[in-house]
């Protein structure tokens, strides 16, 4: 069995790992490719400390992002209902449809929070009334708000 050496990746390497990962590779691969190309560093105490510091900082950033998303969720759900005005015809049907952009604009007007329209999930809306809409604020945080489609 060949001896393997540990290196810390300085960049993402295809089929090997991401920046900051501690990986075991063949000594020739490390010596002839990874180290000369600047894709990895040999493992030392100082490098391991840097890796741990980076991981801790990244974990703290992810926790802060999730907390901010939860705060935005409570703010959106506190307001609860957003009104979108559309031109309507007979039988409560509206001209056109309500889009993700309309919902994002209504949320921005009411809360001054910018919401990406691609993160909004809503049903097909062709009539006046009340509808439930999901707004994805984070990978783990989704807010559910109600929109009211009203006539102009």
Curated annotation (Swiss-Prot):
Record-level GO BP terms: translation
Keyword set, alphabetical order: Ribonucleoprotein, Ribosomal protein, RNA-binding, rRNA-binding
InterPro entries given in the database record: Ribosomal_bL9, Ribosomal_bL9/RNase_H1_N, Ribosomal_bL9_bac/chp, Ribosomal_bL9_C, Ribosomal_bL9_C_sf, Ribosomal_bL9_N, Ribosomal_bL9_N_sf
GO (cellular component) term, any one: ribosome
GO molecular function, one term: rRNA binding
Pfam families for this protein: Ribosomal_L9_C, Ribosomal_L9_N
PANTHER family noted in UniProt: 50S RIBOSOMAL PROTEIN L9
Similarity comment: family membership: Belongs to the bacterial ribosomal protein bL9 family.
Function: Binds to the 23S rRNA.
Protein name: Large ribosomal subunit protein bL9
Source organism of the structure: Synechococcus elongatus (strain ATCC 33912 / PCC 7942 / FACHB-805) (Anacystis nidulans R2)
Gene that this polypeptide is encoded by: rplI
């Amino acid at each position: 069995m060949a001896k393997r050496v540990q290196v810390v990746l300085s960049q993402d390497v295809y089929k090997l790992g991401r920046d900051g990962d501690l990986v075991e590779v063949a000594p020739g691969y490390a010596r002839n490719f990874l180290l000369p190309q600047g894709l990895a560093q040999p493992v030392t105490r100082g490098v391991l400390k840097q890796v741990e510091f980076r991981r801790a900082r990244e974990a703290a950033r992810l926790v802060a992002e999730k907390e901010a998303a939860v705060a935005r969720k409570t703010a959106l759900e506190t307001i609860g209902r957003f009104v979108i005005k559309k031109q309507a015809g007979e039988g409560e049907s509206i001209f056109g449809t309500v889009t993700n952009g309309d919902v994002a604009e209504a949320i921005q007007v009411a809360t001054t929070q910018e919401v990406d329209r691609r993160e909004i999930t809503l049903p097909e809306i062709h009539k006046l009334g009340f509808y439930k809409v999901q707004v994805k604020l984070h990978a783990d945080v989704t807010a559910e708000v109600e929109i009211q489609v009203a006539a102009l």
